[in-house]
Amino acid sequence: MTTTLSGPDQQAQTLTIAEDIHVRASLEATFASLITQLGRQNETPDGKPLPMILEPRPGGRWYRDLGGDNGHLWGLVQSIKRPVLLEIWGPLFISTGAISNLMYRLSEVDGGTQIAFKHSLVGPVPDEFQQNMAPGWEAIHARVKRAAEAARPE
C-alpha cells in the first residue's frame, strides 16, 4: 500500500492511498463482497460492527443510519459499472470540509480478481486520520477478500 501526503499546511493537503488486492474469487463474487463489506457488514478495524447503508446505483447514498432520521452521510455513488467499477465521492468520516473520491476498479486475472483501490482526498486532514486511514482501508479490504473467497464454489 502506498500513501502520499502533500501540501504546506493542514488546510491545503492532498492525500492519496492506493492498494492492489488479489482475490481468489470471480469478479461477481468479489464485487458482491465489496458492496456487502462497505455496507451492512462494515466493521471498525478492531472488529466492532459499524453497519452502513450503501445504495449501489448512480447517486446512491453511502451513510450510517442512527435511527430517528439521524446519521452520517459518507458519500454518494458517483459511478458504478457492475462488476468492474465502484466510485464514491463525499466527505467520508472527516468533518473538516475535506472531500474524498474512492475508486475500486476490478479486473479478471489468472486465479481470480484484482482490485485496484485508490482514495484521493483534498482538504484539511487531522493527524489522527492521517495515521489511521491506510490501516482502516486495509482492514476493510481484508474482509472483502475473506468473504469473497469463502463464498466461491468449490
Sequence positions of predicted segments:
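Hydrophobic pocket/interface hotspot
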Residues: 30-34, 62, 77, 88, ...
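Residues at helix-coil transition
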Residues: 35-39, 82, 142, 146-149
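Structured surface interface patches that mediate subunit assembly and partner/cofactor docking
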Residues: 13, 43-49, 53-54, 138-143, ...
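A short small-residue
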Residues: 14-16, 117-124
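A conserved amphipathic terminal alpha-helix motif
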Residues: 2, 121-154
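Conserved beta-strand segments that form the floor/walls of ligand-binding pockets within enzyme
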Residues: 16, 22, 87, 105, ...
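Hydrophobic ligand-binding cavity/cleft-lining segments
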Residues: 1-50
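Hydrophobic-ligand binding "helix-grip"
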Residues: 52-53, 58, 63, 67-110, ...
